[in-house]
């Protein structure tokens, strides 16, 4: 993965996770995440009973969007990702709790989204070429 993409993913903390719903539609959830750059995985916490986790178990191929929140057009950055949902490894749990130590107080499970494909957009790069 390009280092610019890794740097951007590390700089953010909130992702939007999308998966197929029971009726063939799309369901979305926002999650705080940590990045396992060695294994190219996004790590997040949630509870087993939540709708997005139940849907991801049924259809583990998911989509992710991470975007910089800005109104300045040349500062727009983001990454679109196709990922595979699974339970996090013990090492990934450590990565997550290092970034969000307060999450240890919750009784949530830790999950990983293994990145299969990523597309990065950075308007600063795009607009500088015009």
Task: Map each language-model feature to its residues.
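Short, surface-exposed beta-strand-loop junctions and turns on beta-sheet-rich folds
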Residues: 48-52, 70-71, 127-128
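Charged, amphipathic alpha-helical segments
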Residues: 1-3, 49-52, 94-96
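A generic structural signal for nonpolar/aromatic side chains embedded in well-ordered alpha-helices
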Residues: 9, 55-56, 96
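Structural motif
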Residues: 39-41, 61, 117-119
């Amino acid at each position: 993965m390009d280092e610019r993409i890794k740097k951007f993913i590390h700089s953010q903390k909130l992702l939007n996770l999308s998966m197929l719903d029971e009726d063939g539609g799309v369901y979305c959830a926002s999650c705080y995440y940590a990045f396992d750059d060695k294994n190219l995985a996004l790590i997040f916490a949630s509870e087993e009973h939540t709708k997005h986790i139940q849907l991801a178990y049924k259809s583990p191929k998911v989509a992710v969007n991470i975007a910089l929140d800005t109104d300045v057009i040349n500062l727009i950055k983001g990454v679109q990702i196709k990922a595979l949902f699974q339970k996090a490894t013990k090492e990934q749990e450590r990565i997550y709790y290092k970034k969000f130590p307060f999450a240890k107080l919750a009784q949530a499970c830790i999950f990983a989204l293994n990145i299969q494909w990523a597309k990065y957009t950075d308007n600063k790069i795009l607009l500088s070429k015009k």
